[in-house]
Curated annotation (Swiss-Prot):
Species lineage: Bacteria, Pseudomonadati, Pseudomonadota, Gammaproteobacteria, Pseudomonadales
Similarity-based family: Belongs to the OMP decarboxylase family. Type 1 subfamily.
Name of the molecule in the record: Orotidine 5'-phosphate decarboxylase
Enzyme Commission number, as recorded: 4.1.1.23
CDD domains documented for this protein: OMP_decarboxylase_like
PANTHER family xref list: OROTIDINE 5'-PHOSPHATE DECARBOXYLASE (PTHR32119:SF2)
Active site residues according to the UniProt entry: K65 (proton donor)
Quaternary organization: Homodimer.
Length: 236
């Protein structure tokens, strides 16, 4: 059974602006999910949206995938920490110096620091896509390489597909957090995610948190959809 005080579902607020995002949030239960704010929504609506969601009781995963020189990226994750988000991410391909700088910058926040997660291989990318940018290894092998770099840099975990989860748990240890997008109940459309898995299967594979978007946000009754998936998740 899952810890009910640590919701495993992260609902992706993939909306173009604040009003529909808040309207959806008002239909959800912060005891059963956290919320992910990504690039489009944050660029348009900014920190005020994050604060509005936090005022409704939600923990926020700020999904901006920072990737820049160490000083710039570490300043960005510090700004996220000042905003009080629960989780923030960077691109592992930014390298060890960048990731270490981010981790060190967050140490001053103590127990209030957000989880610092790295992005490995985007779930929309196939082996052919990786080959197109000069990476000859498979997506799975490249994820493992970047996950090892992430752990060696002292970060909390990685974003990865559920298919890589068993291997990453074996390689990196049970405390290394795995955040998995591409989660779809069997009845949902595959969308643009190439590597997908059901919530139950993902948790059993080793995923710690599940990012779920359209199956909840575009459901006729988002709360009912959330509660259905939540019931499935807590039973694992």
């Amino acid at each position: 059974m899952q810890n009910l005080n640590d919701p495993k579902i992260i609902v992706a607020l993939d909306f173009p602006s604040q009003n529909p995002a808040l309207a959806l949030a008002d239909q959800l239960d912060p005891a059963k999910c956290r919320l992910k704010v990504g690039k489009e929504l944050f660029t348009r609506s900014g920190p005020d949206l994050v604060k509005a969601l936090q005022s409704r009781g939600f923990d926020i995963f700020l999904d901006l995938k920072f990737h820049d020189i160490p000083n710039t990226t570490s300043a960005a994750v510090a700004a996220a920490a000042e905003l009080g988000v629960w989780m923030v991410n960077v691109h592992a391909s930014g390298g060890e110096k960048m990731m270490v700088a981010c981790r060190e910058r967050l140490e001053s926040f103590g127990n209030d620091r957000p989880l610092l997660i790295a992005v490995t291989v985007l779930t929309s990318m196939s082996d052919e896509d990786l080959a197109g940018i000069g990476i000859a290894s498979s997506a799975e092998a490249h994820v493992s390489r970047l996950a090892t770099l992430t752990k060696n840099s002292g970060l909390d975990g990685v974003v990865c597909s559920a298919q890589e989860a068993p291997r990453l748990k074996a390689e990196q240890g049970s405390d290394f957090q795995l955040i998995t997008p591409g989660i779809r109940p069997l009845t949902a459309d595959k969308g643009d995610q190439q590597r997908i898995m059901t919530p139950t299967d993902a948790l059993k594979a080793g995923s710690d948190y599940l990012v779920i978007g359209r199956p909840i946000t575009q459901a006729p009754d988002p709360l009912a959809a959330l509660e259905s998936i939540h019931a499935e998740v807590v039973a694992v």
